[in-house]
Regions:
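Short, conserved alpha-helix that lines the donor NDP-sugar binding/gating region
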Residues: 38, 42, 46
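C-terminal "exit" segments of structured domains
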Residues: 117-130
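Short beta-strand-loop
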Residues: 1-28, 48, 98-102
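Von Willebrand factor
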Residues: 1-17, 41-42, 57-61, 90-94
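Generic recognition of flexible, low-complexity loop/linker segments
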Residues: 45-48, 75-76
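VWA/integrin I-like adhesion module and closely mimicked acidic/polar interface patches used
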Residues: 29-36, 64-115
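Glycine-rich phosphate-binding loop signature in dinucleotide/nucleotide-binding domains
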Residues: 49-54
Length: 130
């Protein structure tokens, strides 16, 4: 799920055997412009859990800051408890280390690119899940 401002969101679903390398490259190159809104991509991820991804967790990758209203966070926490999913944040904060405060209210684990290289983050995430 690619996201930017509240009106910019694009969902790419890659099911086994139903996508090409070019599809993945196109997704990797997606840029929707500036702005950051966390609510819409989180809502999209939860909706995907209703259509075949019911045992999924969310990996939330961002370089931005966004405050979510407390009532939304309460609803999100209820969804997390009911569906038993976790949200792992990956914060692209190499230019401004320590800016985790907008991920803290809804992520169970936060990795910072200012502290770990990309491959270290992947190894850590995989070792926790396997």
């Amino acid at each position: 799920i690619h996201f930017a401002g509240s009106s910019s969101c694009k969902v790419d679903v890659f099911l086994p055997g139903q996508h090409s390398m070019q599809d993945k490259m196109n997704a990797a190159e997606t840029f929707l412009g500036g702005g950051t809104d966390f609510k819409r991509p989180l809502d999209e991820a939860i909706q995907l859990m209703d259509v075949g991804f019911e045992n999924a967790d969310i990996v939330f990758l961002t370089d931005g800051l966004c405050e979510l209203p407390e009532d939304y966070l309460a609803t999100l926490r209820k969804e997390q408890a009911a569906r038993k999913f976790t949200v792992t944040g990956i914060l692209l904060d190499a230019g401004s280390p320590g800016m985790d405060f907008s991920l803290t209210p809804f992520c169970q684990k936060i990795y910072r690119t200012s502290e770990l290289a990309g491959d270290e983050i992947v190894r850590s995430m995989v070792s926790q899940r396997v």
